[in-house]
Design a protein with these regions (language model features):
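Metal-dependent amide/peptide-bond hydrolase catalytic core
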Residues: 2-14, 35, 55, 174-367
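Acidic/histidine-rich catalytic neighborhood of metal-dependent amide-processing enzymes
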Residues: 109-175
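Acidic-glycine-rich active-site phosphate/pyrophosphate-binding loop
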Residues: 77-92, 169-177, 288, 320
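Short beta-strand/turn micro-motifs at beta-sheet edges
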Residues: 86-87, 164-168, 224-230
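Pyridoxal 5′-phosphate
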Residues: 19-20, 224
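A non-catalytic alpha/beta surface segment that caps or lines the substrate-entry region
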Residues: 31-71
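Acidic, glycine-rich active-site loops and adjacent beta-strand->loop/helix elements
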Residues: 80, 95, 129-137, 160-162, ...
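Active-site metal-coordination/substrate-binding segment of hydrolases
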Residues: 46, 71-130, 333
Length: 367
């Protein structure tokens, strides 16, 4: 792949690292959620240049397939949308800066190059997906993949775990909206006001979740007050509840409705938590690859939510999340990735794919 011409004032891209070239190209294309078209087109161009059969699907996802054998069917899925707010793209002191450098264009670019490293001779097939709208409540891209693709034999979801860390699971997510209206009245009237009831609904939710709730523990629910606005006559509040595996969302909604009789509580979205095990073939392959590259392996669960949740709702297949990058820089004003970190991520993914290619448990699961 040729190295793009350097614009005036733009740092040069190292010509000996095609994977860095690819990430640099991706970062130069803004792709906030809902506006991923140019980025998807660039991803297709890059994948075709690396030997993939590639195109965009009806949802706008960039999809590339390489290999055509009868062995394991692997899928690598990351997202190509970002939050809003651009960051000047630059390469400085071994770091590549730009919106999406961590979340999640680096994991996606790493997947593209890892699949290409195994090439058309891969004994099975590798499908790489750059999904749209992961940063939105509906996860449009992952939902479309879930509905239009056969479940793969193994799935790697691309998010910034750090090159030596494998993510085994994520909390689920419950988005709620509470709306209430009350007859207009004087502020001194002791009758409940709409704004007061909305605030009371929030405190009732916290009470129902219990004193140990919070975002610091994978095993406990945690809530965030996303919005609260109104006046004595009309008010609205929105809540984001992160839920652990096995959490009874129906029981929570019943109890909250029972204790907030004046308003209307609406479930906007519900995504269950997901957690795999250390014995999962994908976890084993990624973990072995980290160790083979001299990494101090870490296996974690996260209190956020990702496309792994969305896909696990319908696909009961081996899966884990992995990708280069420091997740503490997600959405940050100085979002960047260390080039060394990124290239290690490419190598780890490549090693893991080779291991999965010979994992007989994957093909046996289809027979």
């Amino acid at each position: 792949m040729s190295v793009p011409t350097r614009a005036p004032g733009r740092p040069p891209v190292p010509p000996d690292h095609p994977a860095v070239d690819t990430l640099h190209r991706f970062l130069r294309i803004p792709s906030p959620s809902g506006e991923e078209g140019p980025m998807a087109a660039e991803a297709v161009t890059v994948m075709r240049g690396l030997g993939y059969r590639a195109g965009t699907d009806a949802a706008g996802n960039a999809v590339g397939v390489i290999g055509s054998g009868d062995g394991p069917r692997l899928m690598l899925l990351s997202h190509i949308d970002t939050v809003s707010g651009q960051i000047p793209v630059r390469l400085s002191d071994g770091r590549l800066y730009g919106r999406g450098a961590v979340d999640a264009k680096a994991p996606f670019a790493a997947m593209v190059h890892a699949g290409a490293a195994l090439g058309p001779g891969f004994p099975g097939s590798i499908t790489v997906v750059g999904a749209v709208e992961e940063e939105t409540p509906g996860s449009k891209g992952a939902v479309a993949v879930r509905e239009t693709h056969r479940p793969p034999d193994a799935l790697v979801v691309g998010e910034p775990s750090g090159w030596s860390t494998v993510v085994l699971g994520y909390k689920g997510k419950l988005d709620l909206r509470y709306r209430v209206t009350r007859p207009p009245t004087h502020p001194s009237n002791p009758a409940p006001k709409a704004a007061e009831l909305a605030a009371e609904c929030w405190h009732t939710l916290l009470d129902l979740l219990g004193p140990d709730s919070g975002h610091g523990s994978f095993g406990r629910p945690g809530a965030t007050l996303v919005a609260l606005h109104g006046d004595p006559a009309a008010a609205e509040a929105e809540f984001d509840v992160r839920i652990p595996p096995g959490f009874d969302t129906d029981a929570l909604l019943r109890a909250l409705r029972d204790r907030t009789p004046y308003g209307e509580l609406t479930e906007l979205q519900a995504v269950a938590a997901v957690r795999t095990t250390r014995r999962d073939p994908v976890v084993r392959a990624l973990s072995a690859a980290v160790r083979a590259h001299g990494g101090e392996l870490s296996q974690k669960v996260k209190t956020a939510t990702s496309d792994m949740n969305t896909l696990a709702q319908a696909w009961d297949v081996p899966m884990a999340t992995y990708g280069p990058g420091d997740s503490r820089l997600d959405h940050a004003d100085d979002e960047h990735i260390e080039i060394d970190e990124y290239l290690k991520g490419v190598s780890v993914l490549t090693h893991a794919l080779r291991r999965l290619a010979t994992d007989e448990t994957l093909t046996r699961s289809r027979t």
